[in-house]
């Protein structure tokens, strides 16, 4: 077809088209706009994986972050050439290269001191710095980066273990959880905890609720919360329904 109106704002026009085609939700657009206003340093763990490298390049092109890709320089450059990707503006960090020895040693010293009471030694910590998840999360922990993306080569359970060791849980909490965001025609729903705590007691549910409330507000939504179990109206006097009842009662009183 032929456009009947002059297009003055091409960015807004592209957003409108993406919405019409179902490629972008209001929440996604808000996140992109926020990220563009203040792009952060994001570490992409598996730089040698095509999907991870494509994501880093696309994120740079969209202006939503300053990508830092972990991996072997030659391998990543070869892959980029095969995929016809430009690495301009992409920082590559080869964590195993001798040039990174000083940083590995600094990270190992910080981690071993942090976990000394758990029996961690400098030698063990230094060995871990050759692993991308430990190295990348130490970048975040020390302020060398702002966020870390991983998971293509490792199970989430292993990633969680490293995150607890390196970054840890906020002092006011004893538990943490994961959240999935569901975009539907009726609106956006935040679901937690979807992966971590299999049989949460009331204390765990309270922590999950507080963390969820904080996260939902971060996304500029007003939280209206519901807790689900397998029993209604006190029909079951033990198990998760009791935990849910205790957690809801606490949240209402506090």
Residue ranges and their predicted role:
Residues 1-254:
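Anion-binding alpha/beta catalytic cores of soluble intermediary-metabolism enzymes, centered on
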